Structure formats: structure tokens, C-alpha cells
Amino acid sequence: MTSPIVTRFAPSPTGFLHIGGARTALFNWLYARGRCGKMLLRIEDTDRERSTTAAIDAILDGLKWLELDWDGEVIYQYSRAARHREVAEQLLASGMAYRCYATAEELAAMREKARAEGRTRLYDGMWRDRDPKDAPGDVKPTIRLRAPLTGETVIEDQVQGRVVWQNENLDDLVLLRGDGNPTYMLAVVVDDHDMGVTHVIRGDDHLINAARQKQIYDALGWTVPSMSHIPLIHGPDGSKLSKRHGALGVDAYRAMGYLPSALRNYLVRLGWSHGDQEIFSTEEMIKAFDLPAIGRSAARFDFAKLENLNGHYIRHSDDAALVRQFEDVLNYVPNGATLKAKLNDATRAQLTQAMPSLKERAKTLLELIDGAAFLFADRPLPIDAKAAALLTPDSRALIGRLHDALAAVEPWSGPATEAALRAFAETNNLKLGAVAQPLRAALTGRTTSPGIFDVLAILGRDESLGRLKDQTTS
């Protein structure tokens, strides 16, 4: 019987949940969910100076927004420091670790000498076999792993393949600092072991850590989890991802109007492929995702592709669900509170009614908000430059006549106003476009909007006639 799959997402709370971290969380989540396993969440807060509560909150909020749930309670690494120290002492007792009394000055000299000689092994092992009786009384020792000096450390990585390090190039790494605090390397191994993690899926910037951590596993006689080191995300030109290219927090993507479903779909295709398929439902992702299908080369972030994908998701979203997304994003955009204050049962109903037309033109929720601005505008309506150019004196006179024609429509509806406008155009020997364009400018303050008959129906009689009256000349 095989043991259940357990993955983990283990961010450090020193900043926001960046896009690379979000993809790592997604890959862990998909792998676990597709195999009836668990994904655990561990906050690696051992760096007390840089870890912040605000960063922890941002990570949790980002995961919740992406709808990536975890199993069990959040584990905080620092709270397990006593257990980490216990394991360090265990290694010390077994002879697989030793106390090192090297001073900061001695260590600096070792590093300088090693670099001058072109060696990657920086620590010279001065306390590896030295009698502890020689220990200076004024130095608080670290505990170092007694790493093998010869042979190889090998990882069979599910993404990178077989990766080999020569042990002569790897240091006796520090497990416990002089102040008694465990290092990241030790804490990760102990936590993964104690939590039953079977699969470690993380960025390939951690690949060198895998070698060091395997040596700790071997020293303890513990089973090494399956390792998968996924390629990093680069900018579209292949350079390191920058803020200009998309190296932003998940919260920034929410504020830019991206849907969590679209961002998940985009992220899963950054480095992973399943034939030529580009669009995946969550269920399809869970079913199809596997580690060997992840490529080794860096994925390239493309804002235009994300935007187009987001537009697809907006167009195919349920209208009521989009209204909820619309309202939610107002909490994260400038002047969102002003617009949110105008949302009530009546305006929500108008927004829902307009959504089939609005969503066809929008690639982000911000574009959706912009397209819906005419619904929430106060009278007299602000008119943009392009619309103002249409509202010539002749057009305003025409609007006055249109006002009178529409005032006679009863009952008010899209089909009824359409019939009235077509009759007006025919009677006055005008093309419908010559009527619709100034009418749109007067009703929405823009030159683009949902269909003009839809606009009239959504605004209703009183608001439509009032806006036309505002733009009429005597």
C-alpha cells in the first residue's frame, strides 16, 4: 500500500505572495488534489528580523483569493524551534554532527582563502575532528553537520532529472547557530519529515539546498521525499523577472482586475504543458497535471497573453458572478469606495442587465468598471472629448427631437425604443447610425457602449430622458 501524497507550500513571510510563489502553491495544490492527497501550508518564519505579520496576512489572503485551500492548520516554523534543536542534539550524540568554535574572523579568513584558491567548500573543517577540550571558553559554538568528504550526493529530480554534486565541494553546513536558533536547512528537513511530506515541489533556485538537505536526511536515516525543482519565471525577453515584466504580488493582479480563475489558468501553463490545450477548467487542471510534463527551461511571463486569457474568462463568466467580482475589486482600486457607495439593489440589477454587453468589450475588471461608468454617473453627465466632438449644435437639436419621440414610448423597453428610433430615422430620412451616435454620446458620455437600445432599456425612462434633456439646446 502506497502512502498518501502530501505536498507543502512553504513561503517565507518577508514580502507579498509574488507570482512565482503563487505558481509554486498552485503546482503543489494541483498535484495533491489530483491524487486525493493533502497540501500543507507552512510559514517559514525563522528569519525573525525580516518576517512580518503583514506579509503573513498577504500570503494567506493571496492564497484564499486564488482559491488554493490547504489542509489542516497553518504551521509556523519558528514555533517548532525546540524540535529542531532536539534533532541537532540527536545528530551531535550520534557523531553525525559536531560543535564548531570558529570565530567570525576565522570564518572570514577561511572564506577569503577558499575563494582565492577557487574552492566552493568555504569551511576548512578546523573543528571537525578537534578535541572539544581545546574549545575556547568565550565562544558560543555552532553545531555543524559532519558531511561526507568523498563520494557524491545525488538527487533524482522529477523535473531536472538526475542531479549530482561532488561531496568534496559541499560544506559542513551549520545546523544550529551560536545563539541556539536552528538554521533554515535543518528546520526544513525536520518539518518535512515530521509532517509526512512525500513530495517537495519548489523553484529551482532551491536545487543546491536539495543537496545539503539530502545529506541531513541521510545522517538521520530518514527517507528523502520526492524532489521536483521547477524552472523560474523570466520576463518576455528572457531576463530576470522584474516588476515591469510582472514580478508583482498576487494582490496587484487582483487590483489590476484579473480573475483568480484566469490567473490560475495562466500560471499553470507557465512551465507545464498538456498538448496544445491552453484553456483549462480547475477540474481539467487537477486531472491532467503531472510533474514530468514540467519543462526545465525558464518560463516567460507575457502580460498580453494573460490579458487575453482574462478576457476569455470574463466573456465566459456567469453574469451574476461577474457582478460579485466587480463589486469585490472595488475594494482594491482607486475611487472604488465612491463607486461602491452607489451600488444598491437597483444599480446591481442595472449592472447585471448590462453585463452581457459589457463583458464582450472587457479584458479586465477595470475595463469592465470603465465600461459600466455610465450606469453610475451623476447628472449632468461628464462627456469625454470624443463624445463632445459629436455633440455639435445640430446634434443637440437632433437630441431634443429624439427626446420628444422617446417620451411618447409606452411601455418603455428595448424593443419599444428601438421601434421608435427606427421610425424617427426613417421619417427624417436619416441612417440609424446618424441617430445612434449622438444619442450614445448624450446617454453615456462616451462613443462606445453597449448597444444603444440596451442602454435605453437599462437606464430606464426617467434617467434616459433626463440625460437627453441635459444635452438639448433650445
From Swiss-Prot:
Pfam families in UniProt: Anticodon_2, tRNA-synt_1c
Enzyme class: ligase
Motif position, 'KMSKS' region: 240-244
Motif ('HIGH' region): 11-21
GO terms, biological process: glutamyl-tRNA aminoacylation
PROSITE patterns cross-referenced by the UniProt entry: AA_TRNA_LIGASE_I
Signal peptide range in chain numbering: none
EC number: 6.1.1.17
Keywords: Aminoacyl-tRNA synthetase, ATP-binding, Cytoplasm, Ligase, Nucleotide-binding, Protein biosynthesis
GO cellular component: cytosol
Positions that bind ATP: 243
Compartmental location: Cytoplasm
Known catalytic reactions: tRNA(Glu) + L-glutamate + ATP = L-glutamyl-tRNA(Glu) + AMP + diphosphate
One term of GO molecular function: tRNA binding
Family: Belongs to the class-I aminoacyl-tRNA synthetase family. Glutamate--tRNA ligase type 1 subfamily.
Function statement: Catalyzes the attachment of glutamate to tRNA(Glu) in a two-step reaction: glutamate is first activated by ATP to form Glu-AMP and then transferred to the acceptor end of tRNA(Glu).
Subunit and interaction comment: Monomer.
Protein name: Glutamate--tRNA ligase
Origin species: Bradyrhizobium sp. (strain BTAi1 / ATCC BAA-1182)
Lineage of the species this protein comes from: Bacteria, Pseudomonadati, Pseudomonadota, Alphaproteobacteria, Hyphomicrobiales
Annotated gene: gltX
